[in-house]
Regions:
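Extracellular and organelle-lumenal recognition/adhesion modules and their flexible linkers in secreted
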Residues: 11, 27-28, 562-739
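Acidic Gly/Asp/Thr-rich repetitive segments characteristic of extracellular carbohydrate-active
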Residues: 45-79, 83, 479, 519, ...
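Right-handed parallel beta-helix/beta-spiral solenoid domain characteristic of secreted/periplasmic
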Residues: 46-51, 58-60, 77, 84-85, ...
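Predominantly extracellular beta-rich ligand-binding scaffolds that present long acidic/polar faces
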Residues: 85-92, 138, 147, 297, ...
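Parallel beta-helix/beta-solenoid
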Residues: 95-100, 112-167, 185-194, 228-238, ...
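Extracellular beta-strand/beta-solenoid scaffold signature
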Residues: 108-115, 135-150, 166-180, 200-224, ...
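C-terminal accessory segments
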Residues: 478-562
Length: 739
């Protein structure tokens, strides 16, 4: 192409004679018909640049010709199975694709395969980029760059369906030469990147990277994001191992940084990072210095690092309102999930946005943390000494399963700081997760009193310790007290410590880590929207719908296929199967979700209650979880649930203050004295509370009675006594067998 200023030359003459062709060396760079070529221009290894017409019947031959004839609106087709040598220089508004059988290969040797420099709306599709080798080539495979002056954006670049192999730096790299110029609407989709990143002395390498040049243009606290609304979906990254002794992280799968708004979805990264030796290690798929990036439904397998990091997924320093959800990692040397804010104050000033509003939910990590420097299933922490950092972090409904692998026994959950940073300013919620420790490592290591930690399943198969601020505790009560009342809310423990009974906790398929249909986990999770105002998504890890009117909540990334059956007769309406003792009135009222299913129970006589006789087969001990959904009316401030053994009149009852919102008292007689292992009280919508306790039925019993009643203050002890209140609204009772 020949330009006069910014305009392309359409006609070139010497005197009165039109120039037929212009060469640069032996390469044709212009001829008069270039502007009149058809919309589809074809290239083949069997074609001719001199005599070709750019048609499928008479194609051109070389990439140099392609670089010369490209005009906005043209589609350039390269014959599948053919190899073209050199570098393709993508032009704005052009589409580059293969035709025929298979994909065309661009063999770029030691150079880049495709360069999209200020290539607005250019599309590169279904091409193979082949470099001279990951330890020989020193460039990127496909590079999209905005080299405009400050503030100009390049829109709608597409890199789709390509295969990239044998490049020493990044496989696919989207970057800028000046900030805040960048790429808007970039799409990197359905590509395969293999065997790259092993010849870059500087580090910061990965299979696919969307970022500014990190040495100069990072830090969204100091300038706008370079990139906006980026889409990275359906890609596969393999064996991007990095270069040993590089001064920074090398060998990540996918990185998105210096970006506002983005989706990273349905990608696979495996066997990357093996050569990483720097303290700042790689991660399979991660974001940093980013706003509103969503990383979802991706898989990372066997991510490696010889030192730190080496994990599956990471929201790192400077992330704001970013999301990790529905991701699966397995067999990584570092944590499956990393929530971390690094120290930018040494560069030399704060360049990062405060780490805030980030979410990790419905992710699955299996047997990660297989190295001494990053021996964790999930890691949450900071080394940034900024009091406004690490705010409103939400980590919920993840499943983290660790085991001893070789010499490594990772801690299932670690929450800590580095460099003496005070973590007391951190805020956030860690709830409804499963932390399953199968090996010899710690169950958890928590070094903060600031974050809310509730309704998680912590279970160690080998009975390993729970650590708090460097001290190991053998009992849950000790750990809860030492850790600042973690897992203690509304006067009751919220922790669940029994085996979650997953389908196959030694498996490799994500579905193996779903709670079995008879798992005791069912219903012990909290309603995080009612408790903390956290909006829940519409599906779990496996795509099962999470109804907006859900009543029972289960920890972990997956719902059971089948809920535990409610064993009560007529659990929502007090008629068939219920005994109504001295009940003055039962009437329908507004339920939890705006319906009219709730009933108002009014009583006048002391001891008035509703009850249901339960019968079962003797011979084995049984554990039942019993409770209901209640809220106060009239002069009621409490609800009582209990059990009676009719033959010998042994009983257990539990009082819940449903005005103050806390467990008030419990009492027992006879065989029930040691039979109730746990209580639970949780918020529900519209002022309702879930109240429940678990109780053991001795093997000799064939019946007992579940009962519930309203209650009012006792005038003598200032507490609560049974059967003196009028007006308890209930929206259903339940009984589950959990053992």
């Amino acid at each position: 192409m020949i330009n006069l200023g910014s305009a392309e030359i359409a006609d070139l003459r010497v005197g009165a004679s039109q120039v037929a062709r212009v060469y640069l060396g032996e390469d044709i760079i212009w001829q008069p018909n270039f502007d009149s070529l058809p919309a589809a221009i074809y290239f083949s290894a069997a074609g001719y640049d001199d005599t070709g017409a750019g048609t499928q019947a008479a194609p051109f031959k070389t990439l140099k010709m392609a670089n010369a004839v490209a005009r906005a609106g043209k589609t350039l087709y390269f014959r599948g199975g053919d190899t073209f040598t050199g570098t393709l220089l993508a032009r704005p508004g052009c589409i580059y694709n293969s035709y025929g059988t298979g994909k065309a290969t661009i063999n770029s040797g030691n150079a880049e395969s495709v360069l999209l420099d200020n290539a607005d709306s250019a599309q590169v599709r279904r091409l193979i980029a082949q470099g001279s080798g990951t330890t020989v080539n020193g460039t990127h495979g496909i590079r999209a760059i905005n080299s405009h002056a400050e503030g100009i954006q390049i829109d709608d670049v597409v890199i789709d369906g390509c295969e990239v192999r044998g490049y020493g730096r990044n496989g696919i790299f989207a970057t800028v030469a000046n900030y805040p110029s960048g790429l808007t609407g970039l799409q990197i989709t359905n590509n395969i990147v293999e065997d790259c990143t092993q010849n870059d002395e500087r580090g910061h390498t990965g299979g696919i990277i969307v970022a500014a040049e990190e040495a100069d243009f990072w830090g969204l606290a100091t300038h706008p994001a370079s990139h906006r609304d980026v889409v990275v979906t359906g890609n596969t990254v393999r064996r991007c191992k990095g270069k040993r002794d590089a001064p920074n992280h090398v060998g990540s799968g996918i990185i998105v940084a210096q970006t506002e708004g983005g989706l990273v979805e349905n990608n696979l990264a495996e066997d990357c990072g093996e050569n990483s030796t720097n303290q700042a290690g790689p991660v399979g798929i991660w974001a940093w210095d980013a706003i509103g990036v969503v990383i979802r439904k991706n898989t990372v397998l066997r991510q490696r690092s010889a030192r730190s990091d080496g994990g599956g997924f990471d929201l790192d320093g400077g992330c704001k309102n970013c999301v990790l959800e529905y991701n699966f990692s397995m067999g990584c040397t570092g944590p499956g999930i990393i929530i971390f804010s690094f120290d930018d104050t040494a560069y030399p000033a704060n360049k990062l946005l405060d780490y805030s509003g980030n979410i990790a939910r419905y992710n699955l990590s299996v047997r990660d943390g297989q190295t001494v420097r990053s021996e964790f299933g999930m890691f949450i922490g900071t080394m940034r000494p900024v009091a406004s950092d690490f705010q409103n972090i939400r980590v919920y409904n993840n499943t983290i399963v660790v085991d001893t692998v070789g010499a490594f026994s990772p801690t299932c959950l670690s929450i800590q700081t580095f460099g003496g940073v005070d973590f007391s300013h951190a805020t956030g919620v860690i709830a409804n997760n499963i932390f399953l420790q199968k090996g010899a490592g710690l169950l958890c290591d928590v070094r903060t009193t600031a974050m809310q930690i509730h309704s998680n399943c912590f279970h160690s198969v080998q009975g390993t310790a729970m650590r708090s601020f460097g001290f190991d505790w053998e009992t849950v009560d000790q750990w809860i007290s030492a850790s600042g009342n973690k897992e203690f809310l509304h006067g009751t423990h919220t922790i669940f410590v029994d085996n979650p009974q997953l389908v196959n906790d030694s498996g490799t398929n994500p579905e193996d880590f779903r709670p079995a249909d008879d798992s005791p986990l069912y219903g012990v999770g909290m309603d995080i929207n009612a408790e903390f105002g956290i909006a829940r998504p519409t599906e779990d890890f496996l795509g099962n719908a999470l109804p907006a009117t859900q009543v029972f909540f289960t920890p972990g990334a997956m719902e059971p296929d089948t809920p535990l059956p409610n064993l009560l007769t007529s659990p929502n309406v007090l008629n068939t199967g219920w005994e109504l003792n001295d009940i003055d009135l039962i009437s329908g009222l507004l339920g939890m979700f705006g319906g009219t299913s709730a009933q108002n129970i009014r009583v006048d006589a002391e001891g008035a209650a509703v009850g249901q006789l339960r019968t079962f087969t003797a011979g084995t001990e049984k554990i039942f979880r019993r409770g209901g959904f209640v809220k106060p009316a009239a002069d009621v401030i409490a609800a009582v649930i209990g059990n009676r053994q009719p033959d010998i009149n042994d009983y257990w009852w539990t009082w819940f203050d449903i005005v103050a919102g806390e467990l008030d008292d419990a009492d027992a007689w006879g065989a029930y004295l040691d039979s109730v292992p746990r209580f639970r009280m949780q918020k529900r919508p519209n002022g309702f509370w879930l109240i429940m306790h678990e109780m053991k039925v001795p093997s000799t019993w064939t019946q007992d009675k579940f009962w519930a009643q309203p209650s009012a203050p006792h005038p003598l002890r200032g507490g609560i006594n049974e059967g003196l209140g009028r007006g308890l609204i209930h929206d259903g009772f339940f009984e589950f067998r959990v053992g």
